[in-house]
């Protein structure tokens, strides 16, 4: 008997080849679809990373986007000044000049009338400028770890003339510095290095965490953000819990979660610029009493990194760590390039191609 295949067998073989080809193509397509989950405690810089992806991979902000950030800049600026004024009462810090009391009243009235998103009137701008240079206000700014203050407070308040100009339009840096609490889930899509990225930013505050869970399926990698500069601060939601200790606890639960046994974990030790300034003045022992090293950036940041890496209970899992400044576009572009290379290598390994 010959070895010729019957028409049926030939058809079955063709079908099998076609299925195999489709599976391979599907596999390659799946390897090109990258789902990234941005996690981390509140105010660790996740939303700023999302804005950077828009700048780096989506051509930046349109003039319409820019206009929409104007009221946010006004509100962030005046709310920051009010936070300092209120903290002066709590910390018993008097104004350097008693005449500032009436300026403070004017600023507080704007908030009471919910007009904080409006452009500053000339009168209000002058009052804010006088308050900002007051010695008591500056003393209170120096104790910002003792109350809740936006990181961008100094950035905006140092630039009141520009923000108060009639023709003011937010710059890219202004937009990166704005702060709006993320509620729900923000999703961004972009392509880079022949890959299709879907990036999810999930609300960081404790009350938002239960909303994360349905994002967890088939995640390629997690970018976990930590604000290094928050080692001497407490949470908004619970003013007895140290922010970095909370981050460590959250990282532990994410890193060792059953959902993420196969997931690459990338750790962004963020706000390195603020940390570099703060570590000279505020001891790391506030968060880590056992720390005996120097109050210097290299040694202190390496210690923080080691604390996070020590939470990883799996010898098979590698934590990819980067020290970042989310408001610095060049830094984030460089880091994200490195992150993408890790994802590509891990993906190829998963497909048996590396």
Curated annotation (Swiss-Prot):
The GO annotation for biological process reads: adenylate cyclase-modulating G protein-coupled receptor signaling pathway
G2 motif: annotated segments = 174-182
Q: Which residues bind Mg(2+)?
A: 47, 182
Listed GO CC annotations: cytoplasm; heterotrimeric G-protein complex
What is this protein's name? Answer: Guanine nucleotide-binding protein G(o) subunit alpha
What's this protein's function? Guanine nucleotide-binding proteins (G proteins) are involved as modulators or transducers in various transmembrane signaling systems. The G(o) protein function is not clear.
Q: Which InterPro entries match?
A: Gprotein_alpha_I (IPR001408), Gprotein_alpha_su (IPR001019), GproteinA_insert (IPR011025), P-loop_NTPase (IPR027417)
Q: Which UniProt keywords apply?
A: GTP-binding, Lipoprotein, Magnesium, Metal-binding, Myristate, Nucleotide-binding, Palmitate, Transducer
Q: Where is this region: G1 motif?
A: 35-48
- Lipid-modified sites (S-palmitoyl cysteine): 3
Q: Where is this region: G4 motif?
A: 266-273
Source organism phylogeny:
Eukaryota, Metazoa, Spiralia, Lophotrochozoa, Mollusca
Q: Where is this region: G3 motif?
A: 197-206
Q: Where along this sequence does the record place binding of GTP?
A: 40-47, 176-182, 201-205, 270-273, 326
- According to the UniProt record, where is the region G5 motif? 324-329
Sequence ranges assigned to domain G-alpha in this UniProt record: 32-354
Q: Which SUPFAM superfamilies match?
A: P-loop containing nucleoside triphosphate hydrolases, Transducin (alpha subunit), insertion domain
What domain of life does the native source organism fall in? Eukaryota
GO terms (molecular function) for this protein are: G protein-coupled receptor binding; G-protein beta/gamma-subunit complex binding; GTP binding; GTPase activity; metal ion binding
Residues covalently joined to lipid (N-myristoyl glycine): 2
């Amino acid at each position: 008997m010959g070895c010729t295949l019957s028409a049926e067998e030939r058809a079955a073989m063709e079908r099998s080849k076609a299925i195999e080809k489709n599976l391979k193509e599907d596999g390659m397509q799946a390897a090109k679809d990258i789902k990234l989950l941005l996690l981390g405690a509140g105010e660790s810089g996740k939303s700023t990373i999302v804005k950077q992806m828009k700048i780096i991979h989506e051509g930046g902000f349109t003039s319409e986007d820019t206009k929409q950030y104007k009221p946010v800049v006004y509100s962030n600026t005046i709310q920051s000044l009010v936070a300092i004024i209120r903290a002066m009462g709590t910390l018993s810090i008097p104004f350097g000049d008693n005449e500032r009391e009436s300026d403070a009243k004017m600023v507080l009235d704007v908030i009471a009338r919910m007009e904080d998103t409006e452009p500053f009137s000339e009168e209000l701008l002058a009052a804010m400028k006088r308050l900002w240079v007051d010695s008591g206000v500056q003393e209170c700014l120096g104790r910002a770890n003792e109350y809740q203050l936006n990181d961008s407070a100094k950035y905006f308040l140092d630039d009141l003339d520009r923000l108060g100009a009639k023709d003011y339009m937010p710059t890219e840096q202004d937009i990166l510095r704005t702060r709006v609490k993320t509620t729900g889930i923000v999703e961004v899509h972009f392509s880079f290095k022949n890959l299709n990225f879907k990036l999810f930013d999930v609300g960081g505050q404790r009350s938002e965490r239960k909303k994360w869970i349905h994002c967890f399926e088939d995640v390629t990698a997690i970018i976990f953000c930590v604000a290094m500069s928050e080692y001497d601060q407490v949470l908004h939601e619970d003013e007895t819990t140290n922010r970095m200790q909370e981050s460590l606890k959250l990282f532990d639960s994410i890193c060792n979660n059953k959902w993420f046994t196969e997931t690459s974990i990338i750790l962004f030790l963020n706000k390195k610029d603020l940390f570099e300034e703060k570590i000279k003045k505020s001891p790391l022992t506030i968060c880590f009493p056992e720390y005996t090293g120097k109050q210097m950036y290299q040694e202190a940041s390496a210690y923080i990194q080691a604390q996070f890496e020590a939470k990883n209970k799996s010898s098979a899992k590698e934590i990819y760590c980067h020290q970042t400044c989310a408001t610095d576009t060049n830094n984030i572009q460089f880091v994200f390039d490195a992150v993408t290379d890790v994802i590509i290598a891990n993906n190829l390994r998963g497909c048996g191609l590396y």
